[in-house]
From Swiss-Prot:
It catalyses: 2 a quinone + NADH + H(+) = 2 a 1,4-benzosemiquinone + NAD(+); N,N-dimethyl-1,4-phenylenediamine + anthranilate + 2 NAD(+) = 2-(4-dimethylaminophenyl)diazenylbenzoate + 2 NADH + 2 H(+). The keyword NAD applies. FMN binds at S10, S16, R17, S18, M96, Y97, N98, F99. This is FMN-dependent NADH:quinone oxidoreductase. Binds 1 FMN per subunit. It is an enzyme of class 1 (oxidoreductase).
Amino acid sequence: MKTLLRIDSSARIEGSRSRRLGDALEARWRAGSPDGAVVRRDLAADPVPHIEATTIAGFFTPADQVTDAMRAATVLSDRLIGEVEAADALLITAPMYNFGLPSTLKAWIDHVVRIHRTVAYDGTTFRGLVTGKAAYVALAYGAGSYEPGGTLAPFDYAKPYLTHVLGFIGFRDIEVVGVEGTSGEEGAAAAALDAALKAIENLPSLAA
């Protein structure tokens, strides 16, 4: 059975445009995997704590030297990475907050991007270890003009960061869908959301 791991990060449980796009992407995934299962992790309802010094020490300490405290500090990271490894596809939904991502999503990333677990380093180059999986990203922007060439494009630290960090740990098939102007005039914001949803409807069924 195929599995989709869905990560939601908007602080808004209701009325979130990024979650709405995520619902549509999830529906397209289900069209291609009708018997599949969706594992959900809502970072607003159940925030992931930021990593601490002991967590970082546990990441970089050789296995035979890890202390009980380090082991306890990396239990959550092990669990989150296990969810990614067990899934056939990953769906992340996120709004842009102050040109970047919600801190809850960054905290999740800091637990998941981990040496020897999701990325290898041979002293010269890095190699992602999360391979053979598709990733889907739904982004919502309060303002407009973040498209390539737009006046706010240089301030988009959400899409480039997410695509780079996912690629860094091994994802190669990354589909990004976004909606802009969600904080603008109500009619224009609704039209932008409808256009983004229609674009998702026109996608082929998403691969697991």
